[in-house]
Amino acid sequence: MPKTLILFDFDGTIADTKSIAFKAYQVIAKHYGIEMESEAQMNALNQLSIKDRLKAYNVPLYKVPTLIKKSSEIMHETIQEAQIFEGMEALLRTLKARGHTIAIVSSNRKSIIEAFLNSHQLDIFDALIGKAPMFKKEKSIKKMMKHFHAKKHETIYIGDEVRDIEASKRLGIDVLGVAWGYDAQSLLKASAPNNLFDTVDDLTKYLLTL
């Protein structure tokens, strides 16, 4: 069935925010007495599930909202350093030109995402929802679908984390995983998205068949 509503995650899907996320990781790690000296350490953590990452830091689950708040503060100060993934702008503009509704549903702050989009002249999205619940992202996805009167078979979500895939599955919509973001490809594959792509070019070729 045609996909009229195409939803994107932001960090690790549209924007390469790993370098600024590393700065946030460093601050958080230092708070827990852990030295994080390289992005390789952060990438190693991304091979683990979120629960296992918290265990590695000895961080209780109830602390997650506080950590997210601190990370957001750091990202707000440094978002101008982030870059759009190569080929992503062309993909987004092509989808828009072909008549698709494109929107962002992200757990990041709306103000941070808007600052990035403005700096890259990406005023092409039909809507944006920020601060989507970390482990209940389907609530925000459902809200976006309702806004555009989109049915499940008309909607597809694209993200780089297992929680994106799990949220989409709980909602009953198709979901595409992308392996250039945060979660390791092995984790994404195990969560069984409808398709998993290694490059923006491969994703583009697929989306242009919809």
Predicted region positions:
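N-terminal helical cap/lid subdomain that shapes the substrate entry/recognition surface
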Residues: 3-89
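Conserved Lys-Pro-Asp/Glu-containing loop-to-beta segment of HAD-superfamily phosphomonoesterases
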Residues: 5, 138-165
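A short, structured active-site edge motif that brings together acidic residues
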Residues: 41-42, 123-135
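Short beta->alpha linker loops
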Residues: 45, 83, 87, 108, ...
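Short, acidic loop-to-helix structural element flanking the phosphoryl-transfer center
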Residues: 77-107, 114, 139
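Glycine-rich phosphate-binding loop signature in dinucleotide/nucleotide-binding domains
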Residues: 98-100, 148-154, 210
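Structural recognition of alpha->loop->beta junctions
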Residues: 120-128, 187-207
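Acidic, Mg2+-coordinating phosphoryl-transfer loop and its flanking beta/alpha structural elements
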Residues: 157-197
